[in-house]
UniProtKB/Swiss-Prot annotation:
One of its GO terms (cellular component) is cytosol. The gene is rpiA. Pathway: Carbohydrate degradation; pentose phosphate pathway; D-ribose 5-phosphate from D-ribulose 5-phosphate (non-oxidative stage): step 1/1. The keyword Endoplasmic reticulum does not apply. It comes from Burkholderia vietnamiensis (strain G4 / LMG 22486) (Burkholderia cepacia (strain R1808)). Substrate binds at residues 32-35, 85-88, 98-101, 125. Its EC number is 5.3.1.6. This is Ribose-5-phosphate isomerase A. Belongs to the ribose 5-phosphate isomerase family.
Amino acid sequence: MTQDELKRLVGQAAADYVIQNVPEGAVIGVGTGSTANCFIDALAAVKSRYRGAVSSSVATTERLKSHGIKVFDLNEIDALQVYVDGADEIDASGAMIKGGGGALTREKIVASVADTFVCIADGSKRVPVLGAFPLPIEVVPMARTAIGRRVAALGGVPVLRVTKDGAPYITDNGNEIIDVKGLQIAEPRAFEAKVNAWPGVVTVGLFAERGANLCLLGTENGVETIIYPA
């Protein structure tokens, strides 16, 4: 199967998981990116079962609305039973690198309030150690050089994310992103806490403190379900 076919496979598997485990009338937390889009497309077929969704980005909001799925602000919701999102990398503990699509801060906020985080990914995203995929850090623009120096001191190579026109990429929150290459993150929870404590960091794209509860992993043999210890 192609990577796109695997994404559609796990998107449908996530919709099936939601149908089986989330009661009718609930609100679903939805991530951002090409794999999350496959979940949205599959969820559209059963949208009448649920009140709607909480979105993690402007792009996801637009896709949800295009399917006629009502989008709620997180502040309107008392409880969120499930959050479904992709990952750029995921390790054996359920810790992830996320943010390749630029929505890491809102993704982390929505994930933090959900009872269950369901990661959907193709098999290429499973890694023994996080860091081959550049680690995104959303930063307040005036802090980007200072943050870059801190990253370099840890052995990373900071690269400012830019648009195709060469201008700094701006997040939905009005900030910039530094992508850090050359890392091997053996202790993702400690590394997440360290980077998040730097002045000027909005959030780092490590999801270790709040990692995945389970992963629906698309492989040539079908969908593998991996459950991570709490």
